[in-house]
């Protein structure tokens, strides 16, 4: 059983009176800058299971990637690119500050996509106070289903209740209306369009920067979102 670390007061309040173990699973250690890897066990719900990414997920991700791209605004691998994509994700994980998952449809056991924690931020070298959910893509058959919102809830629960962060970022290319609608549907709050915020991930836009639509969830909003 993983240790929980010290929970923030707001995280204790959010979980009080309600058994959240079924949602957030066994607790991983709270990340700390002295050991900043965003390690996390599998997260399971009724709709989707998020398994820490391994090379064993490559065949399933290849099938999930069939017909998934090219995406107009995001980096989605083709089936032939999946093996290298997984290798890069695992290299980022091993370097710290990145925790990739394979998304598994609970009803069928099929791999239907990829998602991750990234961009951790530390309070004056101390506790983790913010993290991002991103690097998300889904097989065409899983888009528009309950998989994406269910996965987001699992990740939000672990970050807000388990790690006790003060903020979770979710962002997308400002031009991606479908992704913006999907993020808003999770209950995340739209904050702003950040101009020229980061390099574009859109095909054919290497070397260009994009405007980014920024959303977030904070502890006071979590009871409504969950």
Where in this protein do the model-derived segments appear?
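Conserved active-site alpha-helix within GNAT-family acetyltransferase domains
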Residues: 176-192
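Conserved GNAT acetyl-CoA-binding A-motif
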Residues: 161-171
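Conserved acetyl-CoA-binding loop-helix of GNAT-fold acetyltransferases
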Residues: 144-158, 181
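GNAT-family acyltransferases
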Residues: 23-145, 158-162, 197-198, 203-226
């Amino acid at each position: 059983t993983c240790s929980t670390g010290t929970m923030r007061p707001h995280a204790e309040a959010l979980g009080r009176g309600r058994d959240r173990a079924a949602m957030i699973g066994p607790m991983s250690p709270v990340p700390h800058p002295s050991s900043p890897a965003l390690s996390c066990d599998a997260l399971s719900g009724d709709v989707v299971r998020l398994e820490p990414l391994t090379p064993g997920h490559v065949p399933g991700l290849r099938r999930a990637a069939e017909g998934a791209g090219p995406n107009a605004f995001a980096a989605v691998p083709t089936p032939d690119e999946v093996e290298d994509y997984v290798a890069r994700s695992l290299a980022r994980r091993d370097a710290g500050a990145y925790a990739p998952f394979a998304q598994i449809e609970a009803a069928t056991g099929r791999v239907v996509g990829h998602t991750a924690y990234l961009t951790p931020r530390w309070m004056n070298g101390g506790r983790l106070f913010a993290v991002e959910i991103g690097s998300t893509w889904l097989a065409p058959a899983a888009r528009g289903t309950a998989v994406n919102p269910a996965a987001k809830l699992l990740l939000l629960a672990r970050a807000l209740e388990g790690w006790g962060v003060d903020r979770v970022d979710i962002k997308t290319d400002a031009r991606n209306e479908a992704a913006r609608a999907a993020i808003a549907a999770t209950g995340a709050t739209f904050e702003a369009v950040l101009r020229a915020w980061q390099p574009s991930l859109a095909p054919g836009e290497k070397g260009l920067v994009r405007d980014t639509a920024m959303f977030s969830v904070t502890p006071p909003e979590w009871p409504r979102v969950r």
